[in-house]
Amino acid sequence: MEKPDLYVVARFLDIMFSNGPSMKKTNIQMLLGVNYPRFMEYLEWLLKRDLVAASLDEEGTERIKLTPKGIESYHRLVDWIKETLDGVKI
């Protein structure tokens, strides 16, 4: 994916920031509202840029969490969208 939709990236980061320290991929995908192949493209894009990280929990389930860089990006991108596009829901 060369040019992701920044609104989808913002929604992804917002979901991660708002729903706890880590989440299962399926839960993120359902909240994001995109099909699974498209979700995986965004996840891979975010992983390559160190905005999110994958790890296994104690049960061996893969979980995704925001990195410090992802938290910073969340604040910059999502806050900018909320300020600039007054009334737009992320």
Where are these regions (language model features)?
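Basic, amphipathic "hinge/linker" alpha-helix immediately C-terminal to the N-terminal HTH DNA-binding motif
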Residues: 60-77
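Short acidic, hydrophobic short linear motifs in intrinsically disordered regions
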Residues: 21-31
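A short, conserved structural fragment
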Residues: 47-57
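Short, locally clustered residues in the helix-turn-helix/winged-helix DNA-binding domain
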Residues: 13-20, 78
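Short amphipathic alpha-helical interaction segments
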Residues: 2-3, 33-48
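Short alpha-helical segments that sit at the start of domains
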Residues: 1-13
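Amphipathic alpha-helical dimerization/coiled-coil segments
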Residues: 76-90
